[in-house]
Amino acid sequence: AHTPPRFIGEMLAAQLSSFPGISTRLVERRNGPLQVGQADGIACRTVEMFEAFGLGHKLVREAYWVNETVFWRPSKQDRTRIERTGRVQDTEDGLSEFPHVIVNQARLQQYLLDYMRQSPTRLEANYGLEFVTLKVEAEGEHPVVVTLRDVATNTQSTVRAKYVVGCDGARSQVREAIGAVPRGDFANHAWGVVDMLATTDFPDIRLKAAIQSADEGNILLIPREGGYMVRLYVDLGEIDPKQREAFRDKHTQESVIATAQRVLRPYTLDVKSVVWFAVYQVGQRVTDRFDDVAAEQSALRLPRVFIAGD
């Protein structure tokens, strides 16, 4: 198949879907749109980007607004109990016309999918296709040769493209294919994330809250859109780099919730339903380059493959 550009990334594909002269292909390994979980915080300036698609006000109407943050620490009288110690405005005045908001990543992606379907190109995502490898040939109108695997049938196909943009995350296969190397280290610190419906007497359950206990760790509490659901980021402590998989197996949904309940003492947390759960470790790494042209080749040719996104 010949596809002038091919993209792995929804924001960029949505932008290009407005141009009938540009043929774009959006490839996603999952078998369908994201339903729950993953990222949920949207900075003011990101909302401005969605407004460029005409979606900013729709997003703001649906989302939870983060107007302030409260802080809880161990009580000086009884360090087994927490108490509120501070309250601050979440974003400074004049930063943006839009607020800092919280909304499910699946909703954001659905906004963009709907935008693409209604665009001049009527662009649709291709689900169930996994990136395998690519190579850039020296000549030809479509020099980037990409191999894709159909997840359902395990069959492979080849796509020729003028350009490829890989927006496939921290473990980017596109980045690996062009030989770019991430610099930095995984911070050996883990967090459990739980989206839940719960009954609680904690007074700030509908405010963004940073909660520190004396001995049980820390929680970042994020209210979710809709008025009922809440997300807890629960501090799970340090990880032995050689025991990452065992660490994940040890920290189950139940154990993470139990940790959160201990952090919140003297308040109670009765979890009624868990919508999503994950354990992840914090890391900050940056790739040494963002395209397929090494520094020593920059005067010889223009790039054909790019990596972008988070």
Regions found by a protein language model. Name each.
Residues 12-40:
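Glycine-rich FAD pyrophosphate-binding loop
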Residues 21, 61-74, 79-86, 93-94, ...:
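FAD-dinucleotide binding site
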